[in-house]
Design a protein with these regions (language model features):
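P-loop/Walker-type NTP enzyme "switch/lid" segment
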Residues: 4-14, 22-96
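Hydrophobic positions on the alpha1 helix immediately C-terminal to the Walker A/P-loop
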Residues: 19
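Short, solvent-exposed charged binding patches
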Residues: 1
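Conserved catalytic-core segment of NTP-binding enzymes
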Residues: 82-162
Length: 162
């Protein structure tokens, strides 16, 4: 049975696919058999990324497949050391399903309150309403420059999340 990481968010454009792809590439470079399940069939960002990498001969090759549902992705998950679920934008019922089956759930966010507030709301809903273990939910600061003050403020805000 492979390890499963879900990358989900309440809103689009916060770096879900970028984070899913960089994580997958890092593990693949270390010799893991990795697959990204691109669950946003309307945009297919991770799948398009794979096509560009293949055309350019970039390695390591990361397996990416578009799936219409999580259950379709789960059918092949055990064939891989690591399956990364690249969730669709906006939290839905599928977001809860991804959270339930993932060993680690990553919620990417920017540094602004406009990004962090909905992310915290989602984390709280997953833990309090849907019973997702809070210890497997983590935040990833994306597109976060190098301002020590901004990073410290963001970490403080996110650390106050139950």
């Amino acid at each position: 049975m492979g390890y499963k990481i879900g990358v989900v968010s309440q809103k689009g454009g916060v770096g879900k696919s970028t984070l899913a792809r960089s994580t997958a590439s890092t593990y693949a470079a270390a010799g893991w058999n990795v697959k990204i399940a691109d669950l946003d069939i309307n945009q297919s960002t991770s799948f398009s990324w794979l096509q560009r990498r293949l055309k350019s001969g970039i390695t390591p090759v990361v397996n990416v497949e578009c799936f219409g549902t999580l259950s379709q992705a789960l059918r092949v998950a055990d064939a891989y050391d690591l399956m990364i679920f690249d969730g669709a934008p906006h939290a839905t019922k599928a977001t809860v399903e991804i959270a339930k089956v993932s060993d680690l759930l990553v919620l990417p966010t920017g540094l602004s309150l406009d990004d962090m507030e909905p992310t915290v709301i989602l984390a709280n809903a997953l833990a309090n309403k849907h019973g997702i273990e809070s210890g497997k939910i983590c935040f990833a600061l994306c597109r976060a420059g190098n301002s020590e003050t901004e990073l410290a403020e963001a970490r403080e805000y996110l650390s106050e999340t139950p």
